[in-house]
């Protein structure tokens, strides 16, 4: 979702998606995905449920810019040609989930994704499942 939100739709080139741990869950726990956005932007997405270090990190590298966002530690670092910018965020990690549910229960849908967005996400999930 984050990648589509930032860069738009992408085409999947390669996927490994399976359950490889002994966790007692009914879902895959490992994903390695490579793909390409329009404008020759490449992506690599790695997810796993079994790592012992809680990590939610987004890394973006380009010709003149690098961005590192740590969603657990609530900070972001921007590197451009000349400077490094560090930003610390103060937010409650569960806030967005609570607000999402509160808005749904109160029938406030102004910040919700569209049906088309949801269908696009489901299309990506279905493509990943087909790679097995």
Regions found by a protein language model. Give the residues of each.
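C-terminal helix-rich "cap/oligomerization" subdomain common to oxidoreductases
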Residues: 36-38, 103-132
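Generic alpha-helical secondary structure signal
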Residues: 6, 11, 99-101, 105
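Phosphate/oxyanion-binding loops and surfaces in catalytic or ligand/nucleic-acid-binding neighborhoods
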Residues: 6-9, 33, 66-67, 128-131
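NAD(P)-dinucleotide binding in Rossmann-like oxidoreductases
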Residues: 22-29, 39-102
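Generic low-polarity alpha-helical segments
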Residues: 10-13, 62, 74, 128
